[in-house]
From Swiss-Prot:
It comes from Campylobacter fetus subsp. fetus (strain 82-40). Located on the platform of the 30S subunit, it bridges several disparate RNA helices of the 16S rRNA. Forms part of the Shine-Dalgarno cleft in the 70S ribosome. Belongs to the universal ribosomal protein uS11 family. InterPro entries: Ribosomal_uS11 (IPR001971), Ribosomal_uS11_bac-type (IPR019981), Ribosomal_uS11_CS (IPR018102), Ribosomal_uS11_sf (IPR036967). Part of the 30S ribosomal subunit. Interacts with proteins S7 and S18. Binds to IF-3. One of its GO terms (biological process) is translation. PROSITE patterns: RIBOSOMAL_S11. Disulfide bonds: none annotated. This is Small ribosomal subunit protein uS11.
């Protein structure tokens, strides 16, 4: 039986100066995606993907780590200026936005909230009783 060859996928460097950072902060997790201006994904990260499990995924610290990981990946592709689009009501939302400003060599152009608001659409989940 022949041995399988392990082929490593080569990371292609894209020299992109401007990008958009999408932060999706849910109650359970925080996802960060960095795209170019056309919407093609360059880098992404999430709190769960970094090893945070269970209730630790929804913490502000996990959101900060996810943003720093995604921005470091994006800096390898030459990103220098970003616009931020935030979605969702999660607890890591504010920390994620602040930590983008703290990344060295990245200039924030704008900040926009793209959370969808229902005009009396679906019934929301029932209130929690703890």
């Amino acid at each position: 039986m022949a041995k399988r060859k392990v082929i490593k996928k080569k990371i292609v460097r894209k020299n992109i100066a401007k990008g958009i950072v999408y932060i999706s902060a849910t109650f359970n997790n925080t996802m960060v995606t960095v795209t170019d201006e056309m919407g093609n994904a360059i880098a992404w990260s999430s709190a769960g993907g970094l090893g945070f499990k269970g209730s630790k995924k929804s913490t502000p610290y996990a959101a900060q780590q996810a943003v720093e990981d995604a921005m470091n990946k994006a800096k390898e592709h030459g990103i220098k200026e970003v616009g931020i689009k935030v979605q969702g009501p999660g607890s890591g939302r504010e920390t994620a936005v602040k930590s983008i400003g703290g990344v060295e060599g990245i200039k924030v152009l704008y900040l926009k909230d793209i959370t969808p608001l229902a005009h009396n659409g679906c019934r929301p989940p029932k209130r929690r009783r703890v």
